[in-house]
């Protein structure tokens, strides 16, 4: 990031510097949008909207209104460069992360059908823009969830503490994620339909690989990462949401500790968003963070080297 893109105003650094957030990877602090001046907020907006990821969204989905309305939260590194941000936009929320590879996610606050797609009712749509391109994804219906989970080894689903499914309707790719709290294991399956004439999933328990064409299977065991967490404030359920949101592909094994985020449900929501950019889980996390908890993480990412090499 060039100097002109740095969020390096003294007031920003004074307000959020020295907090000690994830110093192993250079994070210097986090601030709520309310604590920034108008000029500082504009600096954040300018940096995000000059990014290639936002341009990709505008080019492919010109009808989506991502005009910025409010800066909700910001993190910077020690040089003042923008690391993560969450903004309210006209059509929902926009999440920006430049930790490893810059990622922009737009989570709509309305149903998918309202943006011109003939998708089932009660599904939610979101855009994910990365170096690999731009995808418009949606959450699964109850019937699709049933079909997918029945097509996967029954014991795997029954043993999971939580399962999440979302879909790329254009490529008919289904993604399933499940988390085992006891063994601290997160698994992600990238699946495809079995080539049925209707395009509808028709899984069988006997031959899930044939029906699903499992393209990729990732397993992440957080217990093996030797994570150490410390907190200086009392954390109520879900209050660490904006601290962990958007730390895409970095240290999620530590940031998503059940102790940190207040229990199994918000922990899974955290893991799905943070690790794999799955913002349909955001609804499980409160929008606001108690300012007193901005100082809650001291030593976070001892797993940094193993995490980056794993992915």
Curated annotation (Swiss-Prot):
It is found in: Secreted. It comes from Haloarchaeon S8a. Halocin-S8 is quite robust, as it can be desalted, boiled, subjected to organic solvents, and stored at 4 degrees Celsius for extended periods without losing activity. One of its GO terms (cellular component) is extracellular region. Residues 1-230, 267-311 form a propeptide. Has antibacterial activity against the haloarchaeons H.salinarium NRC817, Halobacterium GRB and H.gibbonsii. This is Halocin-S8. InterPro entries: TAT_signal. The keyword Transmembrane helix does not apply. GO terms for biological process: defense response to bacterium; killing of cells of another organism. Keywords: Antibiotic, Antimicrobial, Bacteriocin, Plasmid, Secreted.
């Amino acid at each position: 990031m060039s100097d002109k893109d740095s969020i390096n105003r003294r007031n920003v650094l004074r307000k959020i510097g020295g907090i000690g957030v994830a110093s192993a990877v250079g994070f210097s602090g986090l601030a709520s949008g309310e604590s920034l001046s108008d000029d500082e907020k504009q600096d954040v907006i300018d940096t995000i909207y000059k990014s290639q990821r936002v341009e990709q969204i505008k080019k492919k989905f010109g009808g989506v209104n991502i005009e910025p309305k409010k800066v909700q939260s910001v993190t910077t590194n020690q040089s003042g460069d923008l690391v993560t941000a969450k903004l309210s936009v006209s059509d929902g929320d926009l999440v920006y992360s430049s930790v490893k590879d810059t990622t922009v996610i737009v989570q709509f606050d309305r149903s998918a059908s309202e943006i011109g797609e003939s998708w089932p009712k009660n599904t939610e749509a979101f855009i994910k823009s990365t170096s690999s391109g731009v995808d418009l994804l949606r959450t699964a219906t109850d019937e699709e969830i049933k079909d997918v989970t029945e097509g996967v080894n029954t014991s795997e689903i029954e043993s999971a503490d939580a399962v999440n499914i979302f879909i790329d309707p254009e490529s008919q790719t289904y993604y399933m994620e499940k988390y085992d709290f006891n063994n601290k294991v997160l698994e992600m399956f990238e699946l495809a339909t079995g080539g049925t004439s209707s395009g509808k999933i028709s899984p069988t328990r006997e031959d899930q690989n044939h029906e699903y064409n499992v393209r990729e299977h990732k397993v992440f065991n957080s217990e093996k990462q030797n994570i150490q967490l410390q907190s200086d404030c009392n954390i109520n359920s879900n209050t660490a949401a904006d601290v962990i949101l958007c730390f895409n592909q970095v240290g999620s094994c530590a940031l998503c500790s059940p102790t940190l985020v207040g229990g199994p449900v918000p922990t899974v929501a955290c893991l799905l968003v943070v690790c794999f950019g799955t913002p349909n889980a955001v609804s499980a996390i409160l929008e606001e963070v108690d300012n007193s908890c901005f100082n809650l993480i001291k030593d976070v990412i001892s797993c940094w080297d193993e995490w980056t090499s794993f992915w």
